[in-house]
Amino acid sequence: MIGILNRWRQFGRRYFWPHLLLGMVAASLGVPSNLSGVPDHAALANTSSSQSRQNHGTTNFNSLALLHDIHRRPSFSVDYWQQHALRTVIRHLSFALAPQAAYARVQEVAETERVAPSKIQQLALLDTLNALLTHEFKPPAIIRYTEQVERPVLSPYKPGLWLAQVQGIRAGPANLS
């Protein structure tokens, strides 16, 4: 009986919880927190600007197509539990992808002979996962161009000229007198 419970616990730790956590994170990324349609009245004061924000952010599941118009995350702040879940998923992936003593074996082999491309790709993936776990995310820098590009002044759009030039159709009188 103890063996069955131990195997069930190992199965849950290896397969069930990481996949459940990954599904929860994937389902919650990019979706507004008030998707249920109930505005959070406790967090906002009763002012006219906060009421307009509540009305603007309230969505239901039948209007998910309108979500692309809503600016979902105006700042780069990440929810603590979402960040914790992402790090846990990345940690699970890194442990699942890392063979026993992969770094030591591949480094020894690399010194003596060429390494297979799959091992190099696996190490690159592990390094990327390690970087995701250990480095803090910084928002991208805003790059502003100091020079303005000189563009030629175009005449206003005239459908008759366009038809004459592109389509070869004369649209208008023969003489412009």
Swiss-Prot record:
The keyword Magnesium does not apply. Pfam families: SecM (PF06558). Disulfide bonds: none annotated. It comes from the Bacteria. InterPro entries: SecM. Residues 1-37 form the signal peptide. One of its GO terms (molecular function) is translation regulator activity. Its main location: cytoplasm. Regulates secA expression by translational coupling of the secM secA operon. Translational pausing at a specific Pro residue 5 residues before the end of the protein may allow disruption of a mRNA repressor helix that normally suppresses secA translation initiation. Belongs to the SecM family. This is Secretion monitor.
